[in-house]
Amino acid sequence: MARLHGLQIRLRPGTVPKTSAVAVITGILLSTTFAAVLATADPPDVLDARYVIEPVTNATDVVTPVGCTHDHRGRLLVIESHTHQRPEGYAGPPHDRIRLVEDTDGDGRADRFRTFHEGTRFTMGIRLGSGDWIYVATRAEVFRIRDSDGDDVADQREQLLRLDTAGDYPHNGLGGLAFAADGTLRVGLGENLGASYTLVAADGSSWAGEGEGGSVFRCSPTGTELSRVATGFWNPFGLAFDPAGRLFTVDNDPDARPPCRLIDVVATGDYGYRFRYGRSGRHPLQCWDGELSGTLPMAAGTGEAPCNVVPYDGGLWVTSWGHNRLEVFTPVVDGATCRATSRIVVQGDHEFRPVDAAPAPDGSLLITDWVDRSYPVHGRGRLWRLRLAQGPPRTGAEGWPPLSAGEQRARRLADDAAPADRSAALRDADPFIRQAAVAGIVAAHAPLPAWERIDDGREKLGVLLARRWQDDVDRYGRLPGGGKTESLATADRDTLLAAALADADERVASFAVRWIADERITGLRPGLERLLAADATPTQLLPAVLAALDWLNQDSADPRRYDRAALQRRLEAIWTDATRPPRVRLAALRMTSDVPKGKPLSALAAIASGPAGGDEPLAGEAVRLLAAKPTADVAVTLEEIAANAALPAARRADAVAGLTRLPQGEARLATLLADAAPEVAATARELAPGNAAPATSPAASTDRGPRPAAHDTAAWTARLGAGGDPEAGWRLFFGGRRARCAECHAVGGRGAAVGPELSGIARRMGRSRVLESLLQPAREVGPAFQPYAVTLTDGRVVNGISVATNDRDRTERFLTADGTEVTVPLAEIEHRVPLATSIMPAGLEQGLSDDDLRNLLALLEQ
């Protein structure tokens, strides 16, 4: 079933030949419909008066466009996708095409369209190389093509890189392409959903991996001498060099760790993400902004779903598919790297979906527009031209910051075989200087200083970084022809890691913990156990140690087969053990996501009910675990805690929040409505079942005047301002039926998994963005949370988010809006249609006071 602005076409799978009458009629209908759509479509808003944006094509001239570039004659080449999640009954060509787009009469509109190349699948990127070679990336290969006889059809093809993997998701394989000044090629590889892979170059050099996340690779323009440049990405979908030779990428975000990132990519850099530890990005062994030892921070956060980064007119232009806009980032030197400040130059509506951009010979910027928010190809598309209203754009180095003294030093450290200041550089406060020294050690195969002679924690960390990169090259890299480099002794590696685990510097021990977990070095489990038991172990290191031990104890390294029940049992054994240090028990309890049963539940209830003056952080965490997922088994415990005036008010109020979600909650809370502790009484009143708490209720004590319309995010942001009580926000998030947040979302690892995990989201994205999502839930639905109406063969319809296939791909699981999981046999699915609305209900703010909203935002800033 295709649904096109009211036009519905039902096609039975396998019954429509490529040249059938149905296909012809369908094409005519689509062309007519889409031409009408374009005629009424408004161009996106240009927020900077220096620029103008104009349409280049009609709706069906080039459809579902992805990448674009200009050939050696200045003509536009555009990837036209026909395979990206191709829907049932799709009437387009069977393969992707590269279209040659020309304006032959000079009126600014394209009027000539020819196919330069076709036959590819999941085609992602395209860039002009040297001479007349055009470089193309699909998810499975990088190749180059050219037209040798002048007929405007590519007739020469050379494969440069091949990705051998079972992974087949359209856009998390190979993608981004960029050429350095010396002609060498950089290629981005996405997280590949953790599937094992081998990237093989034309000369037989290769790199293998599994579960580490995305990486950036380097090879010659002919596909030789493959090497890894940097790692720790989710999906470095777009790559570009600025005029000073800095390499930037835009990186899509994990499910629960926005924002997406603009990153200054440096040799041997690790940017923190590991797919093996899950999609959320919140695992203790993952980070997103350089929080973990040995990782590097982002240059800036970007809009949702950035697809490419393009240098133009003195700035880095980023196409934000998810937020319907073009952002311009201005690099600002910060030591040996660049941060960036941003501004929105073009903002469109929900039908502006920019993917790629290419500076044209005439000084304009050509932009591809996917148009629709749906991932499957849909037969629509646009090309836009952005130009300066007056004069030409800045070119060359004009407008770009020159390399700072720190950046120049970093390049020398990375390139020189034996710089005199390498040891000092490893001790430098700037992580990018230290990383450059590491890159130099790796490139020169330089010997490492003796561990016992190093007295500086940063230098020790640098030695570990270099040793690990060398170890990765030995284990996962292959030389031209397939030969291995000389292997470093595993025994030496493990001896070094054992010493690092015992080091007094937390940064050193933290890096060792992560390395041991990443490589599943089970022989060093005793060292992790000693670290967990030691009184001197820093509290902030404990979650990583616990997570590493859990990973070593897993039967499989495949994150798709992760045994979460076994993790919960191991954590229970720690937090129920009164002989362990309280801070270790607290760390384990915070990592516990589910209320246990049987004997562990009794132990949890005893901790939660502990007397005042005891270990309050542990007791408070126990109450919150019980309250976040209350069941009939814990009702009595929560009632006793809530009613016990001898306990701290905060603990009692959290128990009240849990009681409000239980049956007969109103009766349970009746005696607490006038409790002597204001915090308890207020929570009971505000969260009691049946209390809708409209904006005019007494709870809304600071509300003032008429409320803005839901679409006026700026007015709402100004109205609510800053502040708020995060403790009250937690109780609202998990308690009662007014906000209903915990039915779909989680905070701090507690809650449901229907929607994204929200811990710290307002701190990272800003209050306005979070408010917009709450006020207008259907404005932008992340692709991972796209709901579908699934019609079954018996006529039933299931509305929900697809979670996974099971039973050897014979069934599919869906999560519905109320958190219910429904399993459906795949053979019984007749068709599915993406819903235009979110499963998050609209109008939630109508049942919340201004104080409620402030408190929720304060919680989400933590």
Task: Provide a role label for each language-model segment.
Residues 8, 24-27, 606:
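Generic short N-terminal amphipathic or hydrophobic helices
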Residues 37-408, 825-827, 832-835, 839-846, ...:
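Beta-propeller domains with acidic blade repeats across secreted/periplasmic ectodomains
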Residues 40-47, 53, 270-297, 301, ...:
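Extracellular/periplasmic ectodomains of large secreted or surface enzymes and adhesion receptors
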Residues 6, 14, 27, 481-482:
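Residue-identity detector for glycine
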Residues 6, 11, 35-43:
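Basic/polar N-terminal segments that are highly enriched at the extreme N-terminus
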Residues 1-20:
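N-terminal secretory signal peptides that target proteins for export/translocation
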Residues 22-36:
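Bacterial N-terminal signal peptides
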